[in-house]
Each structure stands twice: as C-alpha cells, then as structure tokens.
C-alpha cells in the first residue's frame, strides 16, 4: 500500500511532516460526513488567489453540508471534533516514488480526536498542483474542482465502488462520453510533442480546442455543459519532476471523464501526451 506524507496548506503558521497509510473511507465515514458542518480552511495570505476563488466556489455551489470559512489556526483548534468536516489544501508526498515531490491536494477530511493530521479520515482528495507551483496556474479551476468533489461525495453515498484507495479509476468508464463534448486545453498543459494544432487534430478524432485559462474559467462560471477541460498537475518548469496527473473534467455535470498519471522521464513529458489522446479516442 502506498504511504503519504501530509503537511498543512499554510507553511507560515505550522507544518506537519508525518507518514501514514492512505486512509480508505468507509460507508460509515461517508454517512457521518453528511451530518457534519464543513469548515473551509483558507490560507494565511489575505491576498491569496485560492482564498478568493474557493470562497466564491463554496458560496455559489456547495450545498451538501452547512459550511463556514476558517483560518489555519482555527483548523488546528477544531480538527479533533468528530462533528466537523474540513475542506482544506494539504501537501502530499509519496515516499515510495523514486523522486519524492510534494503535491497540493484539495481534500475533504473528517474531524477526529487524533494527534496527527494523517490519522484524520479522508473522504476524498484531488491533486491540484505541485507544492511550489504558483497558485495562479490552477486557482481559476477552483469552482470546477470544488463542485466535482461535492458530486463525487454524493456519489459515494450510494456507490460502494468508490470506497477504495484508487477511487478515481472508476471514472475512466466515462471516457467514451467525452466524444460528444468539446475538449478544451491550455497550451502549457500539453506535452511538447502535442503542442501543434496539426498534431492534436491528427491524433484526436473529436473536437479539441486550445484556449486561454480565462476561457475555461468563463465556461466554468457559465456552467457550459458542452465543454470538458484538461486539468493537468505537473512541475510547470520547477526543478522537481516526478508525477504528471491528467484529468478531463466536465463542466455543469461535474463529472470526471479521464484520470491517469505518468512519471516524467525521457519522452514522458510534463503534460497531456499523444498516447492520452489515443486513449480518449476509444
């Protein structure tokens, strides 16, 4: 089983470096979550782009539990209460990986009277960036990520297939449904081999558009159900190069259509690759 190292989203106040087995949620955990109030943990930087975007997302779209916004200090004071849940950015490491990079995950945790954050039950979490990547490269997607997590948790309530360590593999069965949508990608999220429009069109049989991040943010705001977009998590030019996560997320229906990752090495570049496009054709 893989092991994780978690630290809190804010390095200014405190940091927790602990190793723990990955928690697999139970049906009882999911049922308990729906009886909690969810506390959304904001970062300490008052100018944080993430803070602004996640507040907008939660206030507009979060409906499954009552919610309140708190800071990191309050999180430390409240996290042992089992009647509370938390939406929080944590940093994750995979000690068994050859290159031990740190990744930001947007996670939903249950309160528990435990010493370590790693022992708090995690309902689910989605990778959003490498730890040292500027939040402007991903914060614009926050509304889609928050609504996807909400939809995923609702699905967990009735679908036991999602109660697994590899819960997002479940969504790859939706891969064929992407053919009826427009796939929007930002150029920097494509591997170098796939950055020409001719290459994209020759390797992907359906509609694909290279757009700006502002276009994706606008589509998310408008809940454009004709659009799916690439959410890529990679080093973005930073020194640490390890995993590259690739997700195709639907807008409006808040569904995941594709989930995969590869280790960056040799021809395995930072971004969506030609082999991913070919998988999406099927």
Regions found by a protein language model. Name each.
Residues 1-26:
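Bacterial Sec-dependent N-terminal signal peptides
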Residues 21-105:
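Start-of-domain marker
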Residues 38-41, 108, 183-184, 200, ...:
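A compositionally biased, intrinsically disordered/low-complexity signal enriched
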Residues 48-54, 77-79, 96-98, 192-196, ...:
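Extracytoplasmic/secreted cell-surface and envelope-processing proteins
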Residues 59-70, 199-211, 252-254:
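Structural alpha-beta junctions
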Residues 90-147, 216-282:
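Amphipathic beta-strand/beta-sheet edge segments enriched in Tyr/Trp
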Residues 124-179:
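A surface/extracellular/periplasmic glyco- and lipid-processing/surface-interacting theme
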Residues 158-240:
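Flexible, glycine-rich surface segments
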């Amino acid at each position: 089983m893989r092991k994780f190292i978690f630290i809190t989203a804010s390095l200014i106040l405190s940091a927790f470096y602990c190793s723990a087995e990955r928690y697999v949620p139970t049906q009882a955990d999911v049922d308990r979550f729906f009886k909690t109030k969810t506390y959304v943990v904001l970062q300490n930087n008052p100018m944080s782009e993430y803070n602004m975007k996640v507040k907008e997302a939660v206030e507009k779209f979060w409906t499954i539990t009552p919610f309140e916004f708190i800071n990191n200090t309050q999180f430390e004071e409240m996290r042992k209460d089992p009647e509370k849940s938390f939406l929080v950015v944590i940093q994750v490491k995979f000690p068994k990986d050859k290159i031990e990079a740190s990744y930001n995950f947007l996670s939903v945790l249950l309160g528990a009277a435990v010493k370590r954050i790693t022992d708090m039950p995690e309902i689910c979490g989605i990778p959003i960036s490498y730890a040292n990547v500027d939040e402007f490269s991903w914060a614009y997607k926050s509304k889609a990520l928050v609504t996807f997590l909400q939809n995923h948790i609702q699905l967990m309530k009735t679908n036991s297939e999602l109660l697994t360590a590899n819960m997002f593999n479940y969504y790859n069965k939706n891969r064929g449904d992407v053919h009826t949508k427009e796939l929007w990608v930002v150029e920097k999220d494509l591997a170098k081999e796939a950055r020409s429009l001719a290459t994209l069109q020759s390797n992907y049989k359906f509609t694909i558009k290279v757009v700006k991040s502002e276009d994706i943010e606008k589509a998310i705001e408008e809940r454009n159900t004709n659009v799916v977009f690439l959410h890529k998590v990679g080093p973005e030019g930073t020194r640490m190069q390890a995993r590259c996560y690739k997700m195709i997320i639907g807008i409006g229906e808040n569904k995941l259509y594709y989930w995969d990752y590869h280790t960056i090495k040799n021809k395995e570049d930072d971004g969506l690759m030609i082999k991913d496009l070919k998988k999406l054709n099927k």
